[in-house]
Amino acid sequence: MKIALMVITDGRWDYLQQTLQSASECLNYPFSQRLLVDDSGESVGFAPDGFDIIRNLPRKGLAGAIQTGWDHLNDDIDFVFHLEDDFVFPEPVDIPWMVEYLEADPSLAQIALHRQPWSPEERQAGSIYKLGPERFTQRPGWISQRHLFTFNPCLYPVEITKYTADLEAELTAALKSDGYRFGYLGNLDDEPRCLHIGVRRSKAYKL
C-alpha cells in the first residue's frame, strides 16, 4: 500500500510551517512519496526536508496547483493524503482506518477529516454536520454524504486524480455523475479532526 502526502501552499510560509509541524506529529505513516506544490509564484520559497518541491512559475491557483501535484505522483501510488498549508491536527490521524473504508467501498471518492465550524452559518449551527443535517448519514465508523468533494485534509484513491483538477463544486459534479459519494471519518458527534488556521490568503491568490 503506497500513499503519497501531497501538500499545497500559496506561499503563506508561517502557516505552512505550522501545518508541516503538525503533520510530522500526527500523520504517523510511512509515506512513499512526499510532494510540496509551491504555488506562491516565487522562484525560492520554504523548502522542508524530505519533500519533492514543485514550484509553479507563474502561479496557477488552487485547482492548477492540485493538478500539478497529481501530474507529479509516482506511478505506483495507491492513495493520496491531501493537505493544504493552513490546517493542523489536534490528535493523531488513523490513516490505515481511512484506507480500510475506501477499500471496502469503491464508490467512495474520499474520506475527509471534518474541521471546526468556520463560516458564520457553521458557527451558528455548531458544526458542519448540523448545517443541513439531512446531507449526512452515519455509517459504522464514518459519515456518508453526496454534497461535496472537499479539499480539506482527506485521503482519496489515486483513481480520482484521473479527473481534471477543478474547484470543489465542479469536481464534485463530475464525480457524482460517475456515481461517487464522499465520506468523513468518525461519528457525527466527534470533535473536529482538523483545524483550519488560514485567516488570510496570499496577495492576489485565486482559487
Residue ranges and their predicted role:
Residues K2-A4, Q33:
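Cell-envelope/extracellular polymer assembly enzymes that use nucleotide-activated donors
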Residues I77-V88:
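Short beta-strand-to-loop acidic/aromatic patch adjacent to the donor-nucleotide binding site
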Residues L57-H72:
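Glycine-rich, basic loop-to-helix element that forms the pyrophosphate-binding segment
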Residues T137, R146-L207:
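C-terminal catalytic/acceptor-binding lobe
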Residues S24-R55:
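Acidic donor-binding segment of Leloir-type glycosyltransferases
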Residues I111-A125:
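Short beta-strand-to-loop element that shapes/binds the nucleotide-sugar donor at the catalytic cleft/hinge
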Residues R12-C26:
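Short, well-formed alpha-helical segments that are part of the catalytic scaffolds
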Residues P92-H114:
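Conserved donor-nucleotide/metal-binding helix-loop-beta segment in metal-dependent transferases, i.e.
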